[in-house]
Amino acid sequence: MPVADTSQLTSGVAERYASSLFDLALEQGAVDSVTADLDRFQAMLDESADLKRFVASPVFSAEDQLKAIVAISEKAGISGFFANFLKVVARNRRLFALPGMIKAFRIIAANHRGEISAEVTSAHALSQAQETELKVALKSVTGKDVTIAVTVDPSILGGLIVKVGSRQIDTSLRTKLSTLKLALKEVG
């Protein structure tokens, strides 16, 4: 299977699972608690390379994945819908798509609240004031409240890469230097 097909498969799986989780959470009035659990689990993924490898690895059996997910959920204080959701995901051997499920759930929840999500990549962590200023600027462009997810990537050197829906604004120093390099090659 080509790489693009694998990515589309993962995305489709993630969106279906996230949609099901959101529908159930909405029906039970638990969207906020599920979102908090999602955030807690995402923070654990971000902090632990071992957990990231475990989630992505097809080597572990469904039974091993289920046992580990139950232990991790209990230790992190994750219960209710999201804990049960994690069990279903592990039992169905879909942990590899969990990061996409979390992302898709956030997008669905934001859309439900009348917000849009923006993915922001920065060379350095943004201060609270910078995040607020960015939200205000994006709201003036989109006309909607904006939630932002910031990723730090030192390789962009400076500036920002902002993705809102299908639009991307790249003001990174890396891109500007690359453009300058191409322009100089054409001149010389």
Curated annotation (Swiss-Prot):
<dbReference type="GO" id="GO:0046933">
    <property type="term" value="F:proton-transporting ATP synthase activity, rotational mechanism"/>
</dbReference>
<keyword id="KW-1003">Cell membrane</keyword>
<keyword id="KW-0406">Ion transport</keyword>
<keyword id="KW-0066">ATP synthesis</keyword>
<dbReference type="Pfam" id="PF00213">
    <property type="entry name" value="OSCP"/>
</dbReference>
<comment type="subunit">
    <text>F-type ATPases have 2 components, F(1) - the catalytic core - and F(0) - the membrane proton channel. F(1) has five subunits: alpha(3), beta(3), gamma(1), delta(1), epsilon(1). F(0) has three main subunits: a(1), b(2) and c(10-14). The alpha and beta chains form an alternating ring which encloses part of the gamma chain. F(1) is attached to F(0) by a central stalk formed by the gamma and epsilon chains, while a peripheral stalk is formed by the delta and b chains.</text>
</comment>
<keyword id="KW-0375">Hydrogen ion transport</keyword>
<dbReference type="GO" id="GO:0005886">
    <property type="term" value="C:plasma membrane"/>
</dbReference>
<comment type="function">
    <text>F(1)F(0) ATP synthase produces ATP from ADP in the presence of a proton or sodium gradient. F-type ATPases consist of two structural domains, F(1) containing the extramembraneous catalytic core and F(0) containing the membrane proton channel, linked together by a central stalk and a peripheral stalk. During catalysis, ATP synthesis in the catalytic domain of F(1) is coupled via a rotary mechanism of the central stalk subunits to proton translocation.</text>
</comment>
<keyword id="KW-0997">Cell inner membrane</keyword>
<keyword id="KW-0813">Transport</keyword>
<dbReference type="InterPro" id="IPR020781">
    <property type="entry name" value="ATPase_OSCP/d_CS"/>
</dbReference>
<dbReference type="GO" id="GO:0045259">
    <property type="term" value="C:proton-transporting ATP synthase complex"/>
</dbReference>
<keyword id="KW-0472">Membrane</keyword>
<protein>
    <recommendedName>
        <fullName>ATP synthase subunit delta</fullName>
    </recommendedName>
</protein>
<comment type="function">
    <text>This protein is part of the stalk that links CF(0) to CF(1). It either transmits conformational changes from CF(0) to CF(1) or is implicated in proton conduction.</text>
</comment>
<keyword id="KW-0139">CF(1)</keyword>
<comment type="similarity">
    <text>Belongs to the ATPase delta chain family.</text>
</comment>
<dbReference type="InterPro" id="IPR026015">
    <property type="entry name" value="ATP_synth_OSCP/delta_N_sf"/>
</dbReference>
<dbReference type="InterPro" id="IPR000711">
    <property type="entry name" value="ATPase_OSCP/dsu"/>
</dbReference>
